[in-house]
């Protein structure tokens, strides 16, 4: 029987193809303890999984590592899901991990979902029960660890946003068997402080075991029954606990919870100044508009007042007088012109003007004009009219031509 000779590369590739074609090895779920852990700067995670008798090399690439819900550590028991394949260059097989969960965590998730569904059915998550978050709190109660980073973050945010806000801190355990009890006590005590306006329930990030105190059923009811509104800021943005669903407002981090509870003094001052400016402008515009209406009505009233009516009538009378004077003057001028024309015409026909040429007029003693000699026969005396006077003459004789 002839045996084909393979190169090392061919052999490794053959083994790789064989493993890649195996259904079980392509969907492997492996339980073991993490060792030789190395989290590379690229984001890839290299480690080994071991049990009492063996170990296997593992790699988890950045795109999968990003979705992990915990930070892997040496000695941690986990269940890794992935596929077995060969790294051809080294000729070694390894587990390419796509997801990983802490051993025993599955039971916690089951308990979490079971309690979540129970409280949801009881109505603890309904929005109708959410209390309104006060916009301008004066005193904020804080329930958290007195030595944790969460408290430092809340204090820093409060100082930055409004130094006038008072923080009343209730020191509580935030993990461990007694943590839920101290958190419940904190809620009860702060509810008795009359001038506390709002409560922050907070802690920093951690694994599901470390945050488990906030998944307690009694704590959930304490949050639900609180007379004062509660903001939860537990863990990081991706961490959700039971109290987050029950609380009146869930913040992704303790710092974000403080941002919600503590109003920004500078922002408020700017808002007040803006309101003041807008009100001032609005009032000025209203006053300006009303003043225009007032002036308009004033003008109408003045126009219709008895004094103005009399003044206007006087003006009308003056105008009529002026018009009448103009018409009279025009009529007089016209008549004067006519008179002058007629005078000229009369003057032109004045018989006395003939006397200026050397002619005379003869009248009887009754001042009747004599134009025929026959009229003289009955007269003894006549009047002779010259251009510059008259004379009385006696008739001595009458001569006929």
From Swiss-Prot:
CDD domains: ExoVII_LU_OBF. Transmembrane segments: none annotated. One of its GO terms (biological process) is DNA catabolic process. Pfam families: Exonuc_VII_L, tRNA_anti_2. Its main location: cytoplasm. It is found in: Cytoplasm. It comes from the Bacteria. Heterooligomer composed of large and small subunits. This is Exodeoxyribonuclease 7 large subunit. It comes from Clostridium botulinum (strain Kyoto / Type A2).
